[in-house]
């Protein structure tokens, strides 16, 4: 405690650097005994560690933070790199699972293992940017968790490619509430001018929690320009979001969390007074497990074993669970002392009570109008409901789930259901997949256990996060986000009324898919198979940006494609049937190359393509694929294979070693 008081003094008595430093606490209540203040265990529930992925930090650091937070009853955050399934259900499990733009490691089991699912729209330290995990940090374990190959640089896009509007965000929130109806869904925003309007939209999109992330967070791998100049203090964003939600009568529907440089109990109390109910710590927690701010997180050379995957450097890791537990215990103890001094029994009582703050008497402070930040609106200051329930309760699938539960519990006898479907029925098979994942994890059910034959135009996110053992046959058409995050099973879309040149699927299909098969007897929209890392698919045409950021899986396109093919693609392969002879011009050559495969050295690839087309014809009856198979020796000359640069000698070397 004496050591912590030294830290408190250094932080709380520092030069006026942050907005919160220009306010003192005041209260019109008499102090109370500390015994009357809520216990440490209640305060711990409001604490979490900020998102840091397995990959950005070492396995030892990641597991230490998770174990510590589970020990005290707080929450740790997995970050965006997936998590080892061996940790699920143990003290090493991260309660918060993050869904970021790269969708790395996002599987049905991953999503079901959480009590909170966090959609990371942006990071406070580098707002508006994506991310990269250098190939040097992609070890065999990291590659396995992220469904890619060791040594390959992994790129997270700047935006979520299934979120271009607040309605799109609402759809992703709905998807996540279907796969895990017991988890809160949080949306991480950065502190910026106008974040209040965004926060109101997020609440209307039925998020349960909003995170306001400040610019003072760590993110040791962020560009130096972003660290110095991008983002706003969390205080400004928190005040704006809190008041905008109150002004729109939405504050009672959502919880607000903040992060970005929180270090002491005084920081927590001031954050509560400004409107936050929960608090995340990143840099402080990392320092406790050994971080000494070398700022080489992106180089894999962290000398203390915290932010590296190098086995020799990881042996230098000295962090332990007890240090982290002690830190959060001391923070919570300081919070209790401040609450007792102010005359309040809980953090809940002071959330949003900005009358407990007064501007300091300081000449420098008088140059700014800090009083303006303390304006007050009437209404709820805290969340009043356990979940921000959507109007759509997905009764359609819940009724189907009742029919399927006996088979899910005892999959020895397969079941076939025939149903009508409409575009009102969103995220079809996602709720079913969640129940399968809860019982069997990613192993799912045996192939073909559940067959769902549906007629009509499906809603968005057909088969999102789908588990193994489910086959969906659609007689009609799909919509946007077909097979988003699917892990297994098969989706086949055909239409009696439409031919190969008709669109039977929308935009961003197979986004972040980790397995399974998608056959569409028609065209699909833009950003097809973006961040695909394991699914196999055949379609008959796409829009722009196909196979973007792809890291695994196989895509076969039997028709026209749009421009920017394979941008950011670092794994997997695509076969493209180029009848018009202009495909080569559409390839983004930065990371990939287009190769002809009509020679003997590519016989393995030709065999793979032929086998896929045979299965596709059997499932869809495609005339175009049938023509190719019947004339394979000549039609193979019209195919290009797109793969990461250098794949040709690699394949040749593999065959030589067989």
Kindly label every feature range from the protein language model.
Residues 1-144, 321-332, 336-450, 458-462:
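Conserved, well-structured core domains of diverse proteins
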Residues 9-13, 70, 74, 104, ...:
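Generic secondary-structure signature for well-ordered alpha-helical cores
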Residues 89-127, 133, 299-301, 305-334, ...:
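A structural-propensity feature for long, helix-poor, extended segments
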Residues 313-314, 325, 338-342, 351-354, ...:
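Long, distal/terminal scaffolding or interaction modules
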């Amino acid at each position: 405690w004496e050591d912590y008081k030294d830290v408190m003094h250094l932080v709380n008595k520092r030069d006026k650097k942050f907005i919160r430093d220009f306010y003192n606490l005041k209260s019109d209540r008499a102090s109370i005994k500390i015994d009357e203040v809520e216990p440490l265990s209640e305060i711990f529930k409001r604490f979490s560690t900020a998102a840091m992925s397995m990959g950005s930090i070492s396995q030892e650091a990641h597991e230490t933070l998770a174990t510590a937070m589970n020990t005290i009853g707080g929450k740790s955050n997995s970050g965006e790199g997936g998590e080892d399934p061996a940790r699920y259900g143990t003290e090493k499990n991260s309660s918060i699972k993050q869904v970021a733009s790269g969708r790395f490691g996002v599987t049905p089991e991953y999503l079901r293992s959480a009590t909170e699912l966090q959609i990371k729209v942006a990071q406070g330290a580098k707002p508006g940017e994506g991310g990269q995990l250098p190939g040097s940090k992609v070890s065999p374990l990291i590659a396995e968790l992220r469904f890619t190959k060791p040594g390959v640089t992994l790129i997270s896009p700047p935006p979520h490619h299934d979120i271009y509007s607040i309605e799109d965000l609402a759809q992703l929130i709905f998807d996540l509430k279907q796969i895990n109806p017991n988890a809160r869904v949080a949306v991480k925003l950065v502190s910026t001018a106008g974040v209040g309007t965004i926060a109101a939209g997020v609440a209307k999109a039925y998020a349960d929690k909003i995170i306001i992330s400040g610019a003072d967070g760590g993110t040791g791998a962020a560009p130096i320009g972003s660290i110095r100049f991008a983002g706003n203090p969390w205080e400004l964003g928190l005040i704006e979001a809190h008041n905008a939600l109150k002004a729109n009568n939405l504050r009672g529907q959502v919880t607000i969390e903040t992060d970005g440089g929180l270090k002491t109990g005084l920081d927590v109390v001031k954050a509560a007074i400004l409107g936050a109910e929960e608090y995340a710590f990143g840099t402080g927690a990392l320092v406790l497990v050994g971080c000494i701010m070398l700022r080489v997180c992106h180089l894999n050379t962290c000398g203390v074993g915290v932010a590296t995957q190098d086995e020799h450097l990881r042996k230098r890791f000295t962090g332990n669970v007890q240090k982290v537990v002690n830190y959060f215990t001391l923070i919570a103890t300081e919070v209790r002392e401040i609450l007792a001094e102010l005359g309040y029994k809980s953090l809940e009582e002071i959330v949003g009570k900005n009358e407990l703050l007064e501007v300091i008497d300081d000449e420098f402070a008088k140059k700014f109008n800090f009083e303006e930040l303390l304006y007050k609106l009437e209404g709820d200051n805290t969340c009043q409901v356990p979940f921000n329930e959507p109007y759509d309760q997905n009764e359609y699938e819940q009724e189907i789930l009742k029919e399927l539960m006996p088979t899910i519990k005892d999959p020895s006898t397969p079941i076939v259901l025939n149903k009508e479907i409409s575009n009102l029925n969103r995220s079809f098979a996602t709720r079913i997949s969640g129940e399968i994942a809860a019982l069997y994890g990613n192993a799912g059910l045996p192939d073909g256990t559940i067959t769902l034959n549906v007629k009509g135009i499906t809603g968005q996110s057909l088969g999102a996060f789908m588990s193994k053992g489910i086959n969906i046959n659609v007689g009609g058409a799909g919509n946007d986000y077909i097979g988003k995050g699917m892990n297994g099973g098969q989706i086949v879309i055909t239409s009696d009324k439409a031919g190969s040149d008709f669109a039977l699927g929308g935009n961003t299909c197979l986004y972040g898919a980790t397995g399974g098969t998608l056959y569409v007897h028609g065209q699909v929209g833009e950003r097809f198979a973006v961040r695909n890392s394991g699914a196999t698919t055949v379609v008959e045409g796409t829009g722009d940006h196909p196979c973007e950021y792809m890291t695994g899986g196989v895509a076969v396109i039997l028709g026209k494609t749009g421009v920017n093919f394979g941008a950011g693609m670092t794994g997997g392969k695509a076969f493209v049937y180029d009848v018009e002879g202009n495909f080569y011009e559409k390839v983004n050559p930065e990371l990939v190359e287009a190769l002809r495969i009509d020679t003997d050295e590519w016989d393995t690839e030709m065999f793979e393509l032929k086998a896929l087309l045979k299965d596709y014809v059997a499932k869809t009856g495609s005339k175009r694929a049938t023509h190719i198979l019947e004339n394979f020796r000549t039609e193979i000359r019209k195919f290009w294979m797109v793969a990461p640069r250098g794949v040709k000698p690699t394949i040749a070397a593999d065959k030589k070693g067989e």
